[in-house]
């Protein structure tokens, strides 16, 4: 009886171990941690230009003046660790200084922000091992659309939410809405990763695989955010070493960790599709045998 149970358990866990082995092999072959380091470097270089371009768009639309403040607080509260307030203060100072730049400097900011999107595109297509390249004009149009429409859609979403909450009939739903808002960062991360894994690669990505990979990445991102914040508050020894410069390594480590999670979700998505193909090929060979 015990042997039968062990055989069943071994038979059920064998596909999982095979998939994990395939996942580890792909992570090693793609040099995932090196790609994450490259993206972290480009992200830090592009962070201030990207934020400057986004909030310059909000400034161009007076109707989004209040929403931009809400969106800014939401981003720093939910996508940065416990030191987000310090990082926010520095970034806002940098953005305020960037507003004094000339037209040539503003073009440089836009190019630097687009550089980050190009790096993300290149890294994900490296993981998917896609040889097909998009036309340059099409890629630029997609990057520009994301850079301009993305913040405006996020601002419109927050504006609509604020308006609905201000209505009298919604007052009785505040408790339900509060509970929904608790998981809103997780849902937002899930949707963002799903869109990233579905749209950016130049080859077709199965929707089911993208949803699973995005969900794992969203869970790891939320867990990593809370774990990183806990480490910073419980073990503040880094402040003794770096002093006032402590925010620099904290931001770099967090950005690097975030890109590791994003790329891991991409690797999971790719490996799921690859594993299904290998499994179907093995089953086909068994059916063809006499």
UniProtKB/Swiss-Prot annotation:
- Kindly state which keywords UniProt assigns to this record, in alphabetical order: Cell inner membrane, Cell membrane, Membrane, Transmembrane, Transmembrane helix
Q: Does the keyword Membrane apply?
A: yes
Show the stretches that span the lipid bilayer: 44-64, 104-124, 140-160, 183-203, 210-230, 244-264
Q: Where in the cell is it found?
A: Cell inner membrane
Q: Topology with regard to the membrane? A: Multi-pass membrane protein
Family annotation (InterPro entries): UPF0761_bac, Virul_fac_BrkB
- Which cellular component appears as one GO term in the record? plasma membrane
Q: Which NCBIfam families match?
A: PRK01637.1, yihY_not_rbn
Q: Which PANTHER family match?
A: INNER MEMBRANE PROTEIN YHJD, UPF0761 MEMBRANE PROTEIN YIHY
HAMAP family found in the cross-reference section: UPF0761 (MF_00672)
Similarity section = Belongs to the UPF0761 family.
Name of the featured protein: UPF0761 membrane protein YihY
Q: Whose protein is this, by species?
A: Shigella boydii serotype 4 (strain Sb227)
Q: Gene for this protein? A: yihY
């Amino acid at each position: 009886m015990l042997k039968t149970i062990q055989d069943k358990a071994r038979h059920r866990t064998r596909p999982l171990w095979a998939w994990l082995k395939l996942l580890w092999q792909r992570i090693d072959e793609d040099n995932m941690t090196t790609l994450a380091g490259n993206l972290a470097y480009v992200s830090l270089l592009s962070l201030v230009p990207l934020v400057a371009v986004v909030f310059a768009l909000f400034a161009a639309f007076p109707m989004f003046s209040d929403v931009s403040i809400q969106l800014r607080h939401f981003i720093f509260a939910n996508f940065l660790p416990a030191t987000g307030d310090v990082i926010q203060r520095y970034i806002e100072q940098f953005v305020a200084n960037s507003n004094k730049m000339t037209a040539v400097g503003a073009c440089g900011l836009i190019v630097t922000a687009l550089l980050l999107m190009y790096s993300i595109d290149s890294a994900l297509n490296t993981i998917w091992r896609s040889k097909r390249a998009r036309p340059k004009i099409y890629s630029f149009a997609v990057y520009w659309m994301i850079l301009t429409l993305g913040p405006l859609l996020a601002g419109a979403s927050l504006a609509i939410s604020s308006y609905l909450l201000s209505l009298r009939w919604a007052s009785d739903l505040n408790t339900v809405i509060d509970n929904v808002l608790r998981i809103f960062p997780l849902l937002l991360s899930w949707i963002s990763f799903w869109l990233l894994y579905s749209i950016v690669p130049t080859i077709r990505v199965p929707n089911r695989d993208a949803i699973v990979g995005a969900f794992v990445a969203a869970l790891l991102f939320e867990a990593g955010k809370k774990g990183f914040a806990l480490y910073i508050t419980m073990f503040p020894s880094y402040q003794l070493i770096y002093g006032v410069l402590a925010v620099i390594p904290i931001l770099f480590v967090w950005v690097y960790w975030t890109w590791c999670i994003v790329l891991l979700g991409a690797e999971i998505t790719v490996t799921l599709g690859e594993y299904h193909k290998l499994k179907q090929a093995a089953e086909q060979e068994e059916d063809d045998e006499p």
